[in-house]
């Protein structure tokens, strides 16, 4: 049922409940009518939608729930506006109200899809509101790994879903370009520039071992110029002793590499925010000073502590260590102050589950500033790790990174690149990248964020129903093929299909497919409200399944014009919703496979 019809029916039910309640208690009686929520029953035989309002109100109204349900139904069907929406109403069990929606109401989804096209499912209900979604936020110390890939998929799709509700969404990447890890990157590159390699005497213990460090050192010594998308070009100084120059070059080099990873993955950001700018602009010091003045800190053992227990943390936390350096959550607090000051009253951070411990500290710091930031700010979506499998074995290493599998490895392997071919990116064609990107994005969004994910390369390469992205894309391609055949054989023009006689769509499979199409708008609203982008992938698999069931049961290429065009209209609407949903995931919708 379309949201507009559902809202109308819920309003009619609420009016019916009020009528019955006043009849039982008197016109002047005061009572609270609970929100009417219609749900699709788990068993199709129980009707199209159901609600339990009679059981909720039976006790307050002093009556039997089943008898109350009967009176509510009688009041409902007596309303003229309900007669075009409801075919039948039944009472089940102790007082459930089960409603069967009219055929016309079910068929209305097809016209809605044709009318709205790519906008079908979206809403402007949150227009004028702004949301910042921060995700990936990797250290510029190496290529993006598969955990970053999961975060990129979650963040990008969630941003799309939230934008579908009318929000103005700002995508942001926070670069942790300050601290010990950046220092380790510099000494790693310096060691490579000196001709050392992992395992050699003199190789720094904390150095990074990936082959990419050798590439950075080579380009630095060759005087190459590199730049991130939002950064100034940096040219290799060729001076092995100039550690600061090496650091700047290495950071710029890896930021550029990460830009290329994100481009291959189809992810774009509106802004890159540098942690180093928080120090250079004095924001960290300013935040700490404000917390001191607010009485949220105390000194002990030469360190400055934040009273995080005041905000629910299990113990107070050190902000500034005895050596004068800050602990890692302090710049996070300063960074979130900038988000608030930029006008983002709703902020969502996508992070690995290993960041769970920082949530209370960041929120405590923000509350301690007393600048109007609400409790629970920001929101978090935490994801668990990804394990990569191939040939039944876990893949732990890659030539690129040395100690982990990179996003680019995963994209290329999932697109069909042979092991070892990833070492020569110029050998990877665009079709391979597209196939790989589609598989990786769909797979990584196909589970709830808080569950561990096993990425099976062999499954991603399968071209059958076992592969979920293939299953959904094949449904889209199959419909495109049928519509082309209808054009060739019967001169059926898709643009004319909205005029088809939809009363022909009476089979259980057709009705079920129409109901699934009508769920898409509510599905997007739910996914946005619950920060649950995986719900879109779940829905698309279900929709593809409903299509296959319908197509196997109903012949579309028939000579009889009325049923042919009606079924073709249903297929065309299904194709559009599949395309819309795949676009929400950042996955292509091929017309041929």
From Swiss-Prot:
SUPFAM superfamilies: Anticodon-binding domain of a subclass of class I aminoacyl-tRNA synthetases, Arginyl-tRNA synthetase (ArgRS), N-terminal 'additional' domain, Nucleotidylyl transferase. It comes from the Bacteria. Its EC number is 6.1.1.19. The keyword Transport does not apply. GO terms for biological process: arginyl-tRNA aminoacylation. It catalyses: tRNA(Arg) + L-arginine + ATP = L-arginyl-tRNA(Arg) + AMP + diphosphate. SMART domains: Arg_tRNA_synt_N, DALR_1. It is an enzyme of class 6 (ligase). Keywords: Aminoacyl-tRNA synthetase, ATP-binding, Cytoplasm, Ligase, Nucleotide-binding, Protein biosynthesis. Gene3D superfamilies: Arginyl tRNA synthetase N-terminal domain (3.30.1360.70), HUPs (3.40.50.620), Isoleucyl-tRNA Synthetase, Domain 1 (1.10.730.10). It holds the Pfam family Arg_tRNA_synt_N. GO terms for molecular function: arginine-tRNA ligase activity; ATP binding. One of its GO terms (cellular component) is cytoplasm. InterPro entries: aa-tRNA-synth_I_CS (IPR001412), Arg-tRNA-ligase (IPR001278), Arg-tRNA-synth_N (IPR005148), Arg-tRNA-synth_N_sf (IPR036695), ArgRS_core (IPR035684), DALR_anticod-bd (IPR008909), Rossmann-like_a/b/a_fold (IPR014729), tRNAsynth_Ia_anticodon-bd (IPR009080). It is found in: Cytoplasm. A motif ('HIGH' region) lies at residues 138-148. Monomer. Belongs to the class-I aminoacyl-tRNA synthetase family. HAMAP family: Arg_tRNA_synth. This is Arginine--tRNA ligase. It comes from Burkholderia vietnamiensis (strain G4 / LMG 22486) (Burkholderia cepacia (strain R1808)). The lineage of its organism: Bacteria, Pseudomonadati, Pseudomonadota, Betaproteobacteria, Burkholderiales.
